[in-house]
Amino acid sequence: AIADGTSMITENVFEARFRFVEEMIRLGADARTDGHHAVVRGIPQLSSAPVWSSDIRAGAGLVLAGLVADGETEVHDVFHIDRGYPLFVENLVSLGAEIERVSS
């Protein structure tokens, strides 16, 4: 979402995969979905917000979006990420990310 231009993404297998777009919009993304397609327009900056992960990829994407957003972003339901990306937080910290896992 932080980029110039417009991108169109097509999902031919699992239409519900775009559920995370609503969460990206909470962060300020300029995005919309229509069936099997999502259109994302680049913006200069995302804002912090609480967001909820609906699956593995969505969770990882929301964490990465939160890292570049202004302010502090809370990503809920991160257990989805654990199923596919072991040591996700630790790996991001080793790359210099300012991220913390907090128990609910």
Curated annotation (Swiss-Prot):
Belongs to the EPSP synthase family. MurA subfamily. It comes from Mycolicibacterium smegmatis. GO terms for molecular function: UDP-N-acetylglucosamine 1-carboxyvinyltransferase activity. Cell wall formation. Adds enolpyruvyl to UDP-N-acetylglucosamine. PANTHER family: UDP-N-ACETYLGLUCOSAMINE 1-CARBOXYVINYLTRANSFERASE. Pathway: Cell wall biogenesis; peptidoglycan biosynthesis. It catalyses: phosphoenolpyruvate + UDP-N-acetyl-alpha-D-glucosamine = UDP-N-acetyl-3-O-(1-carboxyvinyl)-alpha-D-glucosamine + phosphate. It is an enzyme of class 2 (transferase). One of its GO terms (cellular component) is cytoplasm. Keywords: Cell cycle, Cell division, Cell shape, Cell wall biogenesis/degradation, Cytoplasm, Peptidoglycan synthesis, Transferase. UDP-N-acetyl-alpha-D-glucosamine binds at V13. Its EC number is 2.5.1.7. SUPFAM superfamilies: EPT/RTPC-like (SSF55205). InterPro entries: Enolpyruvate_Tfrase_dom, Enolpyruvate_Tfrase_sf, MurA_subfamily, RNA3'P_cycl/enolpyr_Trfase_a/b. The keyword Cell wall biogenesis/degradation applies. One of its GO terms (biological process) is regulation of cell shape. This is UDP-N-acetylglucosamine 1-carboxyvinyltransferase.
